């Protein structure tokens, strides 16, 4: 696909896609609760549709009228054995969180996905679930999908210190803990996104959070709720960066989720001197509008506790750093290696093709800026965030064309991405 290049400026207002993390979890919580859950602004991207289809295969009635999703909750005990292997597509969230839910279901389930999922490590989830009494293993005797899990109605609580900072692993353990008899304790390596904890409370459950320690006493029964999904800051990030680096730009992004465990990119932009203003903030629902304007940027260092708060935004932050004055260092981000692709290597290789001065390290990137970008042939590696990052990079190319292979990957989280960009472009 030939990407849009040499854009003079970007102007306009956008409603970015609904939050992917909350959309996944709204289906899951609706399914394991008693009664009806309605979901407004559900993200109909490929990943979240994989979650929806997965729970239908477990016997959950889910209706979609095009505006609202309605989930007829069955409770944990009402989930039924799937007739076939559950296909999670490209969704790591689906497979890892479902393992936690299935840990308490007394039947065997197989989960598989695409070629990318087949490379995603699962021991980080399987080990604690097996400690709780589930029988979970790779079908091919490795830690990689396909995965087979046989749950048990006698799950034991766990006291677990996380070896990696992963909201997916934490969430899987918490879903299992909701079904276990007794108090489970999870200690995080670093604070990660807390949508699961928030939604446990929203659906009538209880847990205690003390810094990085989470304590949950089970078993618990949840009750269906009405969920309104805000815009996804991870999708908004591409237009935040575009607005900062394309000359004479001003973009208003409406109703973006502003959960503090997800807003690390806003802190980085502020540290780099970028102009992003929060308007119409709704603190109760963790959302607001974001107004971004073209800015002069300076380099920064990114590492430590902030990394889990912006892990998915690091590819587009790397592009931002190519336009900042000085040397930006990203460290402590080794988790990027086990995303849809090795995002450290992918970002470095593809931006280098376009003229960036960027070096991969074992746990991050070193980026010298500012640099002018030029045309070239690049690939998304089938990774939606790499694909969208490269289109924003192409906006800055004044000479030559940019050809993107595997552009269709963006539909995983943002099916209308190219159309939305076209509406802003001048």
UniProtKB/Swiss-Prot annotation:
InterPro entries: Enolpyruvate_Tfrase_dom (IPR001986), Enolpyruvate_Tfrase_sf (IPR036968), EPSP_synthase (IPR006264), EPSP_synthase_CS (IPR023193), RNA3'P_cycl/enolpyr_Trfase_a/b (IPR013792). Phosphoenolpyruvate binds at residues 20, 92, 120, 168, 343, 385. The keyword Amino-acid biosynthesis applies. The active site is at 312 (proton acceptor). It is an enzyme of class 2 (transferase). GO terms for molecular function: 3-phosphoshikimate 1-carboxyvinyltransferase activity. 3-phosphoshikimate binds at residues 20-21, 25, 166, 168, 312, 339. One of its GO terms (biological process) is aromatic amino acid family biosynthetic process. Pathway: Metabolic intermediate biosynthesis; chorismate biosynthesis; chorismate from D-erythrose 4-phosphate and phosphoenolpyruvate: step 6/7. It catalyses: 3-phosphoshikimate + phosphoenolpyruvate = 5-O-(1-carboxyvinyl)-3-phosphoshikimate + phosphate. It is found in: Cytoplasm. PANTHER family: AROM/DEHYDROQUINATE SYNTHASE, PENTAFUNCTIONAL AROM POLYPEPTIDE. Belongs to the EPSP synthase family. Monomer. This is 3-phosphoshikimate 1-carboxyvinyltransferase. It comes from Enterococcus faecalis (strain ATCC 700802 / V583). The gene is aroA.
């Amino acid at each position: 696909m030939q990407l849009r290049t040499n854009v003079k400026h970007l102007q306009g207002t956008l409603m970015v896609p609904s939050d992917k993390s909350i959309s996944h979890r709204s289906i899951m919580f609706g399914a394991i609760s008693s009664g009806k859950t309605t979901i407004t602004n559900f993200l109909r991207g490929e990943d979240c549709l994989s979650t929806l289809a997965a729970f239908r295969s477990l016997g959950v009635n889910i209706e979609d009228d095009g505006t609202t999703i309605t989930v007829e909750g069955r409770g944990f005990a009402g989930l039924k054995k799937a007739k076939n292997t559950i296909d999670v597509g490209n969704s790591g969230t689906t497979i890892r969180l479902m393992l936690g839910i299935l840990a308490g279901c007394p039947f065997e389930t197989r989960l598989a996905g695409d070629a990318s999922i087949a490379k995603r490590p699962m021991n980080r989830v399987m080990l604690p679930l097996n400690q709780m009494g589930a029988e979970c293993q790779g079908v091919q005797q490795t830690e990689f999908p396909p995965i087979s899990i046989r749950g048990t109605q006698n799950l034991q609580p766990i006291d677990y210190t996380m070896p990696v900072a992963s909201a997916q692993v934490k969430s899987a353990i918490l879903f299992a803990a909701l079904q276990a008899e007794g108090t489970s304790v999870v200690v995080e390596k670093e604070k990660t996104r807390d949508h699961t904890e928030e939604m446990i409370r929203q659906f009538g459950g209880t847990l205690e959070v003390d810094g990085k320690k989470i304590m949950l006493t089970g078993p618990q029964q949840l009750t269906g709720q009405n969920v309104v999904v805000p815009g996804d800051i991870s999708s908004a990030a591409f237009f935040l960066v575009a607005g900062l680096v394309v000359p004479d730009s001003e973009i208003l992004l409406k109703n973006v989720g502003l959960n503090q465990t997800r807003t690390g990119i806003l802190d980085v932009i502020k540290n780099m001197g970028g102009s992003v203003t929060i308007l119409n903030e709704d603190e109760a629902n963790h959302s607001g509008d974001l107004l971004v304007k073209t800015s002069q940027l300076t380099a920064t260092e990114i590492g430590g506790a902030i990394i889990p708060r912006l892990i998915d935004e690091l590819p587009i932050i790397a592009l931002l750093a190519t336009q900042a004055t000085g040397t930006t260092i990203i460290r402590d981000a080794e988790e990027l290696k086990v995303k849809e692709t090795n995002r450290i290597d992918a970002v470095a290789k593809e931006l280098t093709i376009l003229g960036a001065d960027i070096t991969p390290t074992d746990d991050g990137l070193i980026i010298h800026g500012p640099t002018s970008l030029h045309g070239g042939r690049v690939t998304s590696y089938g990774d939606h965030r790499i694909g969208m990052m490269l289109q924003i990079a192409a906006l800055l190319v004044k000479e030559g064309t940019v050809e993107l292979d595997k552009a269709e990957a963006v539909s995983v989280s943002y099916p209308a991405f190219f159309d939305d960009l076209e509406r802003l472009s001048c």
